[in-house]
Design a protein with these regions (language model features):
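Non-catalytic accessory segments flanking enzymatic or RNA/DNA-binding domains
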Residues: 1-122
Length: 122
């Protein structure tokens, strides 16, 4: 019998200069992975600099996938829409990072018991 694969839910804060307004914008990316280092390498390849997850939680694949589904639903109106109306796993700058972390912590404490925070994010 194989042991279940550990999954992770992450938040990553990304700041960039908007090409239209020339203002600095901070958005929160969210997602899941079974291999945080590989996921980080993927982001670094896209953005061209070192990436570090701001928050990372771990749990069973089922719980982590359900948490991701919940955040997509609850924050749907705040997800970033790109070319051709494609929605990304980015929460726009109208929602503070602290609010998102508070939401995740509440969901874990009240709905997704079994998910734990990774205290040292590498």
């Amino acid at each position: 019998m194989s042991t279940p694969k550990t999954y992770y839910f992450y938040l990553w804060r990304h700041r960039f200069v908007d090409d239209v307004t020339d203002k600095i914008i901070a958005r929160t990316c969210f997602g899941i992975t079974s291999n945080p280092p590989n996921r980080i390498h993927g982001y670094e390849g896209h953005v061209g600099h070192v990436v570090k997850f701001a928050k990372l939680w771990t749990g069973s694949e089922r719980l982590i996938r359900e948490l991701e589904t919940r955040i997509k639903s609850d924050f749907f109106q705040h997800t970033v829409v790109g070319t051709d109306g494609f929605r990304y796993e980015w929460i726009d700058e109208s929602v503070s990072f602290e609010s998102i972390v508070g939401w995740v912590n509440w969901e874990i404490e009240n709905t997704f018991i079994g998910i734990t925070e990774v205290k040292e994010v590498k």
